[in-house]
């Protein structure tokens, strides 16, 4: 009868003699295709090249709108892109209709050296496919007559310009996102949202409904002209802190900019923060548990962000800068140790933790399992699922041991332990109380509930056996 050989720690750590010349701390250089890690410093990030914006008149905004929506407009120059962004940054205050971004910006001495003098060029061009006028659009929101939305002929120049700025600001989300196939539904929603914020509507939202191809061209233009994109990002980042005390303006900006441009490619960090908000555990405990093999650098990066940058964690964070949240739109080297493609197992584990906690769903468009880094990798998702199960077990156990834990939490944690060991041989009783809970939970094996006896569902795959944590109460 064969026996499993005993493997000691020394066996596992043994290194071949010729290989001992290699450094234990150095690592091979990353492939050139991977962006180089860049340490975030506000003083450096705020100096990325940008243009100085100017206030546009209503006539200039409407004229430019007519230009880029024309059949003849087949290419986007840097000058065109800059005008597009200036239209977006001409967004109006929903209360007094003043220009939001005229109210404040960082002092010029913090910005790039040529901030006041740099001008966009007309040389480079990006192809733009004209929106498809033949698409039949299903209207989810009814059109309004002169009591709401005016026709192109009767609507005032100011009303058109206000709607165009809102529309262009909304379209900036496609600088970092791919347009979905359901884009026409989103066009109806943006018109409805404009009505909620500004208590009026506009014919502009029916005049121009660009195709996915046009939106891809817009994304390409943002990527081709980084100085234009940088200008947008710096203004948005400044506005998040500046307008927090002004809810009506902040909510408009959150819908148009913040929720789309922040934390680009940092699904892991967003997931960690979301999980922390749902569990009664200190952030340090959660990070310690999540620092599993292969995720050390990613979790250490998350710790660095929380310890030095995250506005909810640092002293006086409410008034501190928030450019760090948008820094990856300037340079993808920022925080790239947390980038989804570099930490797939961590992403999978976090996804299943969210699913187990009811934060996210396992199926559907918004499921975290659709994240590109793990979507088609069954092996990584299986490892993530098992580690997520362990995280949930640890969370339940710790919660059940706290002094003011609910009796429900205690019984639930004990029941989860029994479920994990259900495929193993019965363990000898350690305490008399265990027999009492077994009797209370099962009421003897022969007295199954009718629904259990009649079920035709196939048995689920057993969860991996887990060593019982010390001091977990048995009932």
UniProtKB/Swiss-Prot annotation:
Signal peptide: none annotated. The keyword Ribonucleoprotein applies. The keyword rRNA processing does not apply. InterPro entries: Rhabdo_ncap_2. Residues 421-461 are annotated as: Disordered. One of its GO terms (molecular function) is RNA binding. Keywords: Capsid protein, Helical capsid protein, Ribonucleoprotein, RNA-binding, Viral nucleoprotein, Virion. One of its GO terms (cellular component) is viral nucleocapsid. It holds the Pfam family Rhabdo_ncap_2. It is found in: Virion. Residues 421-436, 451-460 have a biased composition (Basic and acidic residues). Belongs to the nucleorhabdovirus nucleocapsid protein family. This is Nucleoprotein. It comes from Sonchus yellow net virus. The lineage of its organism: Viruses, Riboviria, Orthornavirae, Negarnaviricota, Haploviricotina. The gene is N.
């Amino acid at each position: 009868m064969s026996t499993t050989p005993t493997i000691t720690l020394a066996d596992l750590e043994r290194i071949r003699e010729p290989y001992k010349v290699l450094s234990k701390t150095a690592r091979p250089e990353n492939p050139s295709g991977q962006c180089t890690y860049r340490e975030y410093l506000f003083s450096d990030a705020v100096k990325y090249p940008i243009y100085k914006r100017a206030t546009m008149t209503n006539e200039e905004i409407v004229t430019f709108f007519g230009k880029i929506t024309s059949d003849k407009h087949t290419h986007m120059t840097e000058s065109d892109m800059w005008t597009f962004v200036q239209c977006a940054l001409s967004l109006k205050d929903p209360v007094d209709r003043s220009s939001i971004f005229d109210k404040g910006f960082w002092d010029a001495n913090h910005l790039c050296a040529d901030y006041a003098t740099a001008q966009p060029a007309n040389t480079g061009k990006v192809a733009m496919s004209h929106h498809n006028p033949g698409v039949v659009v299903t209207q989810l929101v009814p059109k309004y007559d002169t009591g709401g939305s005016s026709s192109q002929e009767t609507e005032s120049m100011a009303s058109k310009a206000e709607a165009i700025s809102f529309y262009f600001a909304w379209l900036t989300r496609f600088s970092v996102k791919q347009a979905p196939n359901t884009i026409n539904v989103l066009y109806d929603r943006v018109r409805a949202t404009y009505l909620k914020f500004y208590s009026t509507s506009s014919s502009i939202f029916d005049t121009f409904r660009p195709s996915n191809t046009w939106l891809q061209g817009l994304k390409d233009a943002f990527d081709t002209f980084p100085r234009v994109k940088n200008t947008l990002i710096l203004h948005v980042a400044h506005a998040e802190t500046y307008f927090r005390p002004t809810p009506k303006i902040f909510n408009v900006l959150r819908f148009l900019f913040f929720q789309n441009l922040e934390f680009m490619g940092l699904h892991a960090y967003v997931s960690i923060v979301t999980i922390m908000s749902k569990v009664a555990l200190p952030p340090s405990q959660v990070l310690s548990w999540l620092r599993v093999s292969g995720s050390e650098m990613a979790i250490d990066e998350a710790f660095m962000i929380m310890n030095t940058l995250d506005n909810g964690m640092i002293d006086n964070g409410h008034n501190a800068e928030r450019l760090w949240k948008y820094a990856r739109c300037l340079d993808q080297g920022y925080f790239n140790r947390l980038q989804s493609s570099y930490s797939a197992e961590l992403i999978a584990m976090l996804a299943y933790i969210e699913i187990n906690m009811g934060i996210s769903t396992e199926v559907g468009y918004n499921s975290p399992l659709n994240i590109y880094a793990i979507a088609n990798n069954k092996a990584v998702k299986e490892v993530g699922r098992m580690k997520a199960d362990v995280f949930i077990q640890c969370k339940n156990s710790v919660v059940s041991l706290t002094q003011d834990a609910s009796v429900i939490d205690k019984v639930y944690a004990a029941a989860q332990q029994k479920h994990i060991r259900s495929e193993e041989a019965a363990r000898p009783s350690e305490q008399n109380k265990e027999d009492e809970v077994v009797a209370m939970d099962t009421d003897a094996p022969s007295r199954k509930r009718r629904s259990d006896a009649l079920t035709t569902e196939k048995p689920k795959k057993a969860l991996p056996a887990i060593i019982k944590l010390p001091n977990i109460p048995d009932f």
